[in-house]
Amino acid sequence: MRERDPIAGPAWTRIVALLGALVLAPCCNSSRAAECTITVGVVLELTGPAGDYGQAAAKAVEMAFRDLNAAGGVRGCRIVTNTKDSQSQSTVAVDAANQLVQLGKVPVIIGGVLSSVTIPMLTAVTGPAKVLQISPGASSPKLTALGREGKTNGMFFRTITSDALQGSVAAKYALDRGMHRIAVIYVNNDYGVDLYDEFARTYKGLGGVIVSATRYNEKQSSYASEVTAAMAAAADGLYLISTPVDGSTIARAWISMGGPRRFLLNDGMNSADFIQGVGAKYLSEAYGTSSGTSPTVSTASFEQEYKAFARMDPGSPAADRAYDAAAIVGLAIAAATRAEPAAIRAALFTVTDPKGTVIHIGEDEFAKALALIRNGKPIRYEGVIGPVSFDAYGDITGPFRLWRITDGAVTTVGEMSVDEVNALVTRLGR
C-alpha cells in the first residue's frame, strides 16, 4: 500500500488552516483583553512520521486557549500562539524553539510530542535559556534523569507518564498474552531506546526471552533487512516500538515474510492510520499499552467538544494531554505574579494544588478558576486525563491502559495502576 505523503493534498491544506487558526485565537468579551495578547510558543510535529499526533495536539491546544479566552482571558489579555512545525525532526525543532525564545521572547513553549524532538529542544534551548517547556507526549525516562542532574533548570514539565513504568507494563502484558519468546523492532531514537531498555529489564526478569532486538532508522521506504534480522530466531510475537507510518511498513513486511501475527505495540501505535495501513484482518492479536487516564467530568466533556471543534478523533494520541498542558499553562499565566518563565513555573503548582478548589475544563469552569485566582485562591485542575500533580522533576503519575485491536478498532481491555507497577518493579529488585 502506498504511503500517504504528509506534505501534500488535503493533509497539507489542514495544516495550513491549523497554523492560521492557532495564530488567530478567539477573542474574549473583555475590552482590555481585545487590546493585548500574551504569546505562547508551540513546537509540534505537524508533518513527518508523527504528523498525526502533532496535528491532534495542536487542535487541542487551540481549543484550550479558546476556552480560556472565552472565559475572560488571562491577566486581562488574550492568549495567542506562535506555532511552528518541527517536521518530526530534532534539528528543525531546535531551530524553531530558538526563534521563539530569541526573537519571539515567549515565556513558555508547549512541545513536542516525540521525546526525540523534545529532548534536544530542552537541552539546547529552553533549559539553558530558563524558558518553561511543557510536553504532552515525551515519555522518555531520560527527561527525569536530566531533571535530577539539574540540566533542565527545573523548567521542564510533561502531562504524560514516564516510560520507566510503561516498559514494565508492556513486559507483563506480553507474557500475560502468551508471548514468552519475543522479537523486538524499535525506532532508533531516545524514545525507542529508552522504552526498549525498560521493557527488556522487566521482561527478562519475569522469565521472558528476547530472541532478537533490532533498531531501525526512521522514514525508510523498506525495512526488509530489519525484519529479516528480527526473524533470525523463532518468536511468539513481535514488540514493535514505532510510529504509524513506519510501523505500518514494518508490520506489513513482518507479515509478508511469514512472521507470527501476534503483536505488542507502544502507545503511539494506538492509531487508526496504523490499522488501515496494515489491514485490520492481520491485527486480531495486536495488543498495546498507553498512559491511562483517571476519568473525570472533564474527560467526557472533552470527548464531545473536541470531536465537534477539531473534526478529529478525541482518542488521538496526545490530544487529551495537549489540552491539559495548554490549560495548565494558561491558568498558570493567570496566577503568576508576572508573565515571565520563573513566575509561570511557580504558578503551575498553584493551579494544580491538591488542596485547591476543583476545576474542570471548559469556558464556565475556567471563568470560575480565573475568579478564584484573582482572589488569591489556589485551584486543583482536574483535566481530561484526571487530576494533575507534578513532582520536583516535572513528572506526573497515573495508571496505564491495556488495549487490543478488535474488528479494526482499539479497545481497552484492562488497566495497571501505578501501585501495581511499582510493586512489580520492587518484586524484581529494581
Predicted feature locations:
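Bacterial N-terminal signal peptides that target proteins for export
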Residues: 2-17
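Extracytosolic ligand-binding ectodomains
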Residues: 2, 18-19, 30-430
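Bacterial N-terminal signal peptides
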Residues: 14-26
